[in-house]
Amino acid sequence: MIENRPWLTIFSHTMLILGIAVILFPLYVAFVAATLDKQAVYAAPMTLIPGTHLLENIHNIWVNGVGTNSAPFWRMLLNSFVMAFSITLGKITVSMLSAFAIVWFRFPLRNLFFWMIFITLMLPVEVRIFPTVEVIANLKMLDSYAGLTLPLMASATATFLFRQFFMTLPDELVEAARIDGASPMRFFCDIVFPLSKTNLAALFVITFIYGWNQYLWPLLIITDVDLGTTVAGIKGMIATGEGTTEWNSVMAAMLLTLIPPVVIVLVMQRAFVRGLVDSEK
């Protein structure tokens, strides 16, 4: 029997409301700034009442971008979508096949190869990023979608998660597939892949957001403004030195950048939660 403690309920709800307020208030301020004109957004203190210029600001950045060296924002969104989707598809494909080979194929040093993959989790991004940039430069993949996406497709985390899930599948499945004469890829496509759908959904959401939020990598790889991504592009919209930042346009760009990952999470939230729960069983 669970004891009813009113004070604990009140405390829990109070902390929940405060947490939500702390998270949502900056987003509300950004939304208000996106609805104001240049004069109102620079007023001190800035009003917290939404204005009427939201559509005007969105249209301005959508067509013209922000600043003199900025691409139209629709192009940045397209580049970010291509990058995030390619990284997601590549990570899932490479990680699933790698884990499948490690779990079900018997070849020399397979455990050593797995631990070599796993050890990369212990290396900070800063240790790996500049050698990776040098490799991409030597392969002449700077300022290209291939340079943006290929180095980020390998994932030790995803490989580890798929390996742990595959190890929970009963050996009887493999034996039944062998008796039926199924090839390894037939076994993978007809049995392993359908059983992994909930895990795939969870990993898809996590990986898409990871790819969408990339900042440092596009900043190092891309110099062509037509290949810029939204997250790195927003940083470029902020003026330095004597320049003036159009904060209303920057905040409008930030709101547009939030929409795709939010839509992905809302559409796939049930499958995402189910995938996280199933992976813990």
UniProtKB/Swiss-Prot annotation:
Recorded superkingdom: Bacteria
Localization, UniProt: Cell inner membrane
Keyword annotations of the record: Cell inner membrane, Cell membrane, Membrane, Transmembrane, Transmembrane helix, Transport
Xref: PROSITE patterns: ABC_TM1
CDD domains named among the record's database cross-references: TM_PBP2
Gene3D superfamilies in the cross-refs: MetI-like
Transmembrane segments: 16-36, 85-105, 113-133, 142-162, 202-222, 247-267
Statement: the UniProt record of this protein carries the keyword Metal-binding: no
One matching Pfam family: BPD_transp_1
Domain ABC transmembrane type-1: 77-268
Gene Ontology CC: one annotated term: plasma membrane
Main location: membrane
Membrane topology: Multi-pass membrane protein
Protein's UniProt keywords contain Transport: yes
Cited InterPro entries: MetI-like, MetI-like_sf
GO annotation, biological process: transmembrane transport
Family (UniProt): Belongs to the binding-protein-dependent transport system permease family. UgpAE subfamily.
Entry function: Part of the ABC transporter complex UgpBAEC involved in sn-glycerol-3-phosphate (G3P) import. Probably responsible for the translocation of the substrate across the membrane.
Subunit structure: The complex is composed of two ATP-binding proteins (UgpC), two transmembrane proteins (UgpA and UgpE) and a solute-binding protein (UgpB).
UniProt-recorded name of the protein: sn-glycerol-3-phosphate transport system permease protein UgpE
Organism: Shigella flexneri
GN (gene name): ugpE
